[in-house]
């Protein structure tokens, strides 16, 4: 029999401790259930090849002797002890706790061998129960830790895998039922959103027109301006404003918020119309001045130049211009008198523009004294030069009852009752806008009266 390299504690001697048999394989190979290749002939077993390759200390533990349970005496058994017998039989199904009488070699301070034979359900140990259900991975981890650190105390805790229990914080969130919305409220909200989409479209069109008036239109001749796009956008705004005024205002808080948003968008569109009309008035006046000075060419830029002739008599055909094949009857006047054609077109444009502007102000609820259309002089010189254009704006409370009027008062820098702006240069946006519109209208219609065009 080979001796274990593990030294016995000093308190035991060869006389008190009987010789015991050791395992044929080391603890590591036995726990992993692999073949242990070591030296069996030597008294002190050498380290096996696997432990040497792993760099671990090779330990051979002793075999636990077979435990013989004492047979109970049938004569001593009584019916009173049947309950104890049932308890004993039920307790045999669980592994016994090692006591002082069970021969277990706990490692001393100078050794690192750990005897875990009572955890091994293999055939080397003849236990009356089949298995204790200990995971082999846990045992291997304990052995590797004890061998690697060289400690003698058993510090590894055997933790069995815990079952997957449902977390107390995980719960299925049930969707709360959405509050029921009446059909009338839902219809009102849908109508307000559709109205906002329409106003947004008009706003984008007006912004594009304002850019074209400032950049593209000055490069063209006055009778080629696409004025229909501006008038149609102004008319669509008027339709949306009338649609907004027909909707009810007592349809809930959300409907009120949507109405306020639409009102801000409508005021923005109105401001764009005012700016476009102001820029267009300046452009019309500039083109009329050029036409009056003889610098404006007829339609399509074809100015007729009679061919040189030595004859004194010229035919009327020689003095007629070359007409464009696509010429309409409405543009025929531009060939005969370009200046009068430009002046007549400008007067018509201003009349239609002021009329659409006045109707939009009425649909928005803007009082005439605060609007722009009523402050523009159409054919009459009602305002003297340098007169304060903001003086006609009244401060009465009834003029500021409409929400659009209050919003417009905040937008214009010279609000109601402002008497500090005495000139167009020192005034705010509203004063400058009114000054430009009044000046352009006064000069254009003054020329029209001189040529008997203004009624």
Curated annotation (Swiss-Prot):
GO MF term set: DNA binding; DNA-binding transcription factor activity, RNA polymerase II-specific; zinc ion binding
Ranges of biased composition (kind: Polar residues): 75-88
Alphabetized PROSITE patterns for the sequence: ZN2_CY6_FUNGAL_1 (PS00463), ZN2_CY6_FUNGAL_2 (PS50048)
Biotechnology remark: Monacoline K acts as an inhibitor of HMG-CoA reductase involved in cholesterogenesis. Its hypocholesterolemic activity might be useful for lowering cholesterol levels in the blood and reduce artherosclerosis and coronary heart disease.
Keywords: DNA-binding, Metal-binding, Nucleus, Transcription, Transcription regulation, Zinc
InterPro entries per UniProt: Zn2-C6_fun-type_DNA-bd_sf, Zn2Cys6_DnaBD
Renumbered residue ranges of the record's region Disordered: 1-22, 68-113, 296-317
Protein name: Transcription factor mokH
Taxonomic source organism: Monascus pilosus (Red mold)
Taxonomic lineage of the native organism: Eukaryota, Fungi, Dikarya, Ascomycota, Pezizomycotina
